[in-house]
């Protein structure tokens, strides 16, 4: 769980991991546990969705990003046809660089452009706000979003609307 930890030496990695797990267990309240149960997703799946939310936003639009993820997962014959197409997974695969078109061809189950559905597991530690967004996303009809020149996300119901927006943004041209 992302937090500030103090470790006195000599302790090993197992000690550090256990301390983080205990902290997560303290933050993972009965209410959150019930929401996970009610969601129909496993805790691993919720944490995977939460890490995607965490990595895709500065925090201002977590609920909308979570909504897009669920819309893509729950409507595999609409929008992106079940592919999440999350750039944060490409950044994980390429060592943290801005994703390129070539990165979309990296053969890995974490590549959400090549593989449908969720990646096998989280690749980052999501914060509590991202976990809450994964458990209670906004209700929208959005399947697409893009970061604009003003560094805020815009959301779209159709690929055509997103593509029109992208043509107006210098960062994509």
Per-range role (PLM):
Residues 1-173:
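Bacterial extracytoplasmic/cell-wall-associated proteins, especially those involved in peptidoglycan
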